[in-house]
Amino acid sequence: MTKTPTLKEIFYNLQNQMIQKLSTDRKIIFHSPTKGGATELNWIDWLKKYLPNRYQVDQAFIVDSNGRFSEQMDLVIYDQQYSPFVFNQDGAIFIPAESVYAVFEIKQDLDKANFEYASDKIKSVRLLNRTSAPIVLASGRIDNPKKPFQILGGILTLTTTWQDVFGEPFQKAISETDKISRIDMGCCLEKGSFLIKYESDTYSFETSSDDESLIYFFLKLLSKLQELGTVPALDINAYGRALDSI
């Protein structure tokens, strides 16, 4: 009789497949931008496949009602239910800030430079203005607009150059980021994943083992997305004011 695989074995195999894909790209693709693009596409495709359908996943720029843009984000998790303005111009995707749940920077290695780079890009999103408008449900109109939550920020890598993955250099990088630049979570596929919890001016973090990095990251991401609930409805009139005729 064929043995039924356990949930852990299924995720372990998915993790090995992902590591194999990214490692092969790293070895074979010598052009750095092309290599980076392939890595980003692998992460986007994986999350598109396994996240619930309510969550959209793409590489994108984030825009607000004041006409300001973030840097291009490697991976954006967003919702179109109450924020319908998502533009795709020849592959360049523009998403309103109100519809964003989370943004991730994707790199080959987890190290100080990439951690700081990811923090700066996350900050460029969190600095954008987000509106919130009343919504109408089958049960009636909700007149108290939902307060925008802090967008999740993270980093995804294949491996790390830190000998002690979550040791002193990692902790120093966390402590040196300001509140708006904070990284909440990340996955280093070959070495483990992490979730950081902030309280006032202090923080704590938890990590996974190296053989559970993907399942740990995925389940923690799902949990954080559930905690956020639904994105606020954007104020369509605020965006309309960008046009002279409205």
Model regions: which residues?
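Intrinsically disordered, low-complexity Ser/Thr/Pro/Gly-rich regulatory segments
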Residues: 1-72, 77-246
